[in-house]
Amino acid sequence: MCAERARGGKPAPLRVVLCWHMHQPQYRDVQARRYALPWTYLHAIKDYVDMVAHLESAPGARVVVNFAPVLLEQIDDYARQVRDNLDHGAGIRDPLLAALAAETPPAGEAERLQLAEACLKANQKHLIEPYPDYRMLTQMVHWLREHPAGLAYQSEGFFADLVTWYHLAWLGETVRREDGRVCALMEKGRGFDLHDRRTLLTVIGEILASVLPRYRRLAEAGRVELAFSPYAHPIVPLLLDLRAAREALPEAPLPAAKAYPGGEERVRWHLDRGMAVFEHHFGRKPLGCWPSEGGLSTATVRLLSEHGIRWTASGETVLANSLREAGALEEGEDRRWLHRPYRVEKTDTTCFFRDDGLSDAIGFKYADWHADDAVGEFVHHLETIAARGVDADTVVSVILDGENAWEYYPANGYHFLNALYARLSDHPLIEMTTFADCVQAIPQPRSLSRLVAGSWVYGTFSTWIGDKDKNRGWELLIEAKQHLDKAIRDGRLGGEHLELALEQLAICEGSDWCWWFGDYNPAVAVSDFERLYRHHLAVLYELMGEPVPEVLSRVFTHGGGHPAAGGTMRRGSEDHQ
């Protein structure tokens, strides 16, 4: 296609889509309804609230925000818990948040140490060091680690201040700047009483209750496009066919089982349930789907098309592999092949592909830069793309984690995001837009005969399958699924019990568990997620009315690595290390 020109002979602006993905796995035990880890509510009060606040204050900015449905349900549940606690004194089912609301700290040494350890889980440079009182408290916790007998001599005030400061540090920068109650607490600094902690809990409850409606209002105003991922964030191509892992890595070792039993039925369940949860919270059906971890295959796109999904997206290397296989990969530095949408033959779903260099620059490179310098370089890259010529179908897709990057930035990315939205929305050669609008503007994208299956991470599925520990995770899941299928065939499950079991199975099918397995990741994170995975599988057996296999009481993977961003994020391409 020839370079497009707007009215008056000026070059057409470069379409740029920023897509922020928000996701946490299910941390809640569906039986006890207690939360094993606090990351859902902590990211809500820090990152989800900041991201929506930045968009509200930048009326010219337009972006895509993608939510995993299992995350939406957890945010809603937390909001209800806090409201019920404040209104009726009901218990909070997250130990860390409950400690903030409690009149007194735990009495036992083990419980006190557990609480103190939990309050260390924050970025040292940006969430601890800026606050002298919090920093001093964490130094005392490090001493108590070595001298646990000292826990019995710590005052109630020590634990009250520690848990209060932990939550103050995890608040979004926009909240700290704009909420007078929070400013007063931070000014006080120490000696927090129950009234102070209840005030902070009230702030947290307000954030949890309002954050999703704020995104909805922006979507209804046409300023944001909201999209979804399959319900519990499974790797869809692998559920459909485990051998999809070998399309990009032909020698990848696979689990002993030939296939995941009933995989297509399970994918349809995740899509149907995910769309229903999305519509419940946002009042409309989603037009687009960021598939879990950008995992796409030809069969996946066809299922999305059957479900009426207008667009989806994946990683740069997935497209490169697919074009290379078809003999259609254009050589050269301008990479026009990347900055355009495609459509797999015999589908109605448009596919967009992530610019790894631009996306990973935000995720990994710019955190230590001055905000103006970082945004200046980012915009310069876009200007370079525009200078090479904007075709009628040119779209630059910048897709990344919308929650984990910001703790590595000063002020939770406050200055960077403000500058980014201001520069992009005012730039004469750049048009901030959404994938849905691009689908409308480009009704006939380029055609692909098939996709080489892969994810946004290196264009492969090696993050989730293909080594001993990850394959062991799949084998445990497949065995549980086989037991569930037999229980259904035998008529031992039906009605509400069957629905609970299918929901629990969905949780076990999520991508996060295998993401963490293996020695690449930090030991503490691997231990947390491996233990929770085995627990979720054990609950599934209990819901089936079957004894929990003894193997689920044994640890099968250990971490020990020191990856970038603590393992919470990966680069899209090994070329951008």
Question: What is each residue range found by the language model?
Answer:
Residues L185-L208, L212, S305, T317-L319, ...:
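Extended, Lys/Arg-enriched charged tracts that mediate electrostatic binding to polyanionic substrates
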Residues A149, H167-W170, T202-H233, L242-R243:
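Structured, charged N-terminal subsegments at the starts of enzyme catalytic cores
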Residues G263-A328, N404-H427, E431:
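Catalytic domains of cell-wall/extracellular-matrix polysaccharide-remodeling enzymes
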Residues G9-A184, A328-Q577:
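Active-site and substrate-binding clefts of carbohydrate-active enzymes
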Residues C2, D47-H54, L208-R217, R273-A276, ...:
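Short alpha-helical segments and helix-capping/turn motifs at coil-helix boundaries
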Residues N66-L71, P230-H233, G288-L296, A436-V439:
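Short, solvent-exposed turn/loop segments enriched in Gly/Ser/Thr/Pro and often Arg
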